[in-house]
């Protein structure tokens, strides 16, 4: 072939040279492992063998072989060929001539430009061909066998306490989100939520929640606002997936999913020994010398590695794949950075769990890859992998905003030209235009920035935030712990003033409302040293920013309740819930207008049964709702007299005509009794303040010289002007702490009500005895000797009370044992009364209140009746439970009381205070005052109707008496505490 002919076919010669180089390399490296997805094409006897990635043009190959045979000795190698149709050759030739490029194979083409040497370029990214997942259900479970090859540990073991350290976890702003389990009814159109609290689930900080901690890959810690059922504590609770260890054909042990896994589900934590860079290199050489084939090093952060070679858990058996179904992610748990394996897609039960080692896993020498995926790179680990492959995770690539994230990993891994260590990723990112930051991408950027240890990645991420001008995006950055994350980045790169200026510019653009987030992040203490760092631009920017922040106000936030971690979770019972509802109904004022009742679910429509109507003859359909027509104006009430309705007001006005305007309010009640009660309470409080020493203030005050105050002496001697009853009350208050000291020791031996009554009795007895024998010199204080006597007397008194109580309980038990054989006697006592007390049996209904809900006055009068005749020694008769009778036909509701404020105090505290000894005696007086008066007599009958039927008078009169009785029974429960 002439030289001129070779010159005319220069473009073909370049393509053939590259093709021959690939063929020669594949033939010479016969000992190299067969690459998955590509090496199979080099087998001549394989039906699937296709020389398409290697030779694209048969004529070019033949031309090149002829030129080589004329200049060199003939080679015994037989070139691989591929048959093409003439139409395909013509189309490819035309395409190459038009574009100036020639396709070589594997997506690589030769680009020809005038005056420039030929360049190799990748025309398109190699997409992974989807294929059905391979299942390994037939392999046996080898978990126990595999666990014998290493030491199983639960958590990472750190070489020192500073290893794996990261910024402290931030508090979560989420609240509890309880979701009830829905039970399907027989009808598909009706759903009833479960009323059992045990069937509800707390979905707080779950996958579908807007939890800031979960979005930024931070686990909630300890006292979380979500409660003990927080869904964002997977590492701490070791919520591992159900997996098993299997023994593969070429890859050794592997992990198999025993159940279906959803995307992003936590599978296992990668644990081991956390070491720094020095021990990492030593162990690599040591394991290589020991003949350990598999390596288990994972990069935790810059200069820190997790070694699971000899210590770890089942996560170490997760193999490598170039097309993985799992990924490795790093989470902040407390003050440590931890690594976990997560599902990247939906994984079927029986699939092998694999992830890409090129991101964080390292080994001494390159090893052949047996993943069998179409996009397999051929090797795992070693220097070649470290130089050629990208070391960035998919999350970091997405956070950087690179458009072609799918093709980047393959393009960098297959790059023919070598790059310097650590520079190829940065150069590639610089060559790609990142996307603009939107509101949905803030989460990925802040999560990557939280764990970023590389300066160039931090600069790229900060640049995306800095270039954004959308106010909603900035608000989202602040919400995603923006101040805390930027504070950590500022402390990390404070020596680089360019990065510091970048962060300060972002902080200056943040919305400024309150100082709360600024104070919580403690970023001011980090910026303060920058005001004198030496760089004029940084100093000016930091000073202005601190001045702007100092003008902001601190917004008040309700502090979060601190939970006791040792406290048991309260269990809710449906019976307690019913009692609480009845309590609420009793406390709630009754409305005069009827409210619409809740309609129960109706059955199938009548048309579905051919118009026959309901099968049940008792089912008459829903009752029609009748709302009360035109209620009375405020302040007016209705009553009946001889079958006629008249209207009256609280002031005493009566009329037969229905009023249309609100009634004038009555004059306020006399204040004498109220003022007297208030004054007694005020005096008791003032006396208690005089006797209680003031606590030391937390804020130190300037000491002032003490001056003699004559008023202090007069105030101390003021008790001499009190009456004897008032002095006794003061002395009783003085004895109260010492009596209570003894009472507390007997609170588990005696009933609560008896204990209170005994304490009051012993206090009365001590006060009367000391005043009778003139042992009281100052009722506001007692000496140590008197204190010991009081405690000794109280102890003897309560010892006797306990002995009598135990004897009474013993007799009661013996009596019940004797009468146990006769059930009829227990069911119907002789005379219709119970054995324990003389009160008749009363039937209780579900809506009746218990003893604890009765009024204060009723309980106190009952207590006085039980304690009559024995005030110095404990009573042997047990207190019976107070019950209300339920009438068969309840009377109509009464008119409201004259004083509406009295009804609000029905449920006041029932506790007996030692500073109010005469509360029981005063209760009856107040109850008598609070009894409502019956309605005023009706006005004169109208002129048009002077006759009133006599038959209706008796009936209406009976109903009218029912109003008074009902109102009196309601008002009788008001005690002195409620009126005050």
UniProtKB/Swiss-Prot annotation:
Residues in WW domain copies: 630-661
GO cellular component, one term: nucleus
EC number(s) reported in the record: 2.1.1.359
Comp. bias (Pro residues): 661-670, 932-943
Protein family membership: Belongs to the class V-like SAM-binding methyltransferase superfamily. Histone-lysine methyltransferase family. SET2 subfamily.
Lineage: superkingdom: Eukaryota
Compositional bias annotation for Low complexity: 61-78, 870-882
Function text: Histone methyltransferase that trimethylates histone H3 'Lys-36' forming H3K36me3. Involved in transcription elongation as well as in transcription repression.
Entry protein name: Histone-lysine N-methyltransferase, H3 lysine-36 specific
Domain SET stretches: 241-358
Residue segments, region Disordered: 21-133, 562-636, 652-675, 689-724, 767-787, 803-980
One GO-annotated biological process of the protein: regulation of DNA-templated transcription
Any Pfam family matching the protein: SET
